Amino acid sequence: MKRTYQPSKIKHQRRHGFRARMATANGRKVLARRRAKGRQSLTV
């Protein structure tokens, strides 16, 4: 049986990247929360 996490940089960026966050209202809320918290990196 293979492991469940088979990392792919492209899929990771498309789902969790900055442009993916900016594409939806809720994604922008995520970025706003992370900015307010003072996160060094907003997205992966």
From Swiss-Prot:
Residues 1-44 are annotated as: Disordered. InterPro entries: Ribosomal_bL34 (IPR000271), Ribosomal_bL34_CS (IPR020939). Keywords: Ribonucleoprotein, Ribosomal protein. Residues 1-19 have a biased composition (Basic residues). NCBIfam families: rpmH_bact. HAMAP family: Ribosomal_bL34. One of its GO terms (cellular component) is ribonucleoprotein complex. One of its GO terms (biological process) is translation. It comes from Acholeplasma laidlawii (strain PG-8A). This is Large ribosomal subunit protein bL34. Belongs to the bacterial ribosomal protein bL34 family. Coiled coil: none annotated. It comes from the Bacteria. One of its GO terms (molecular function) is structural constituent of ribosome. Pfam families: Ribosomal_L34. The gene is rpmH.
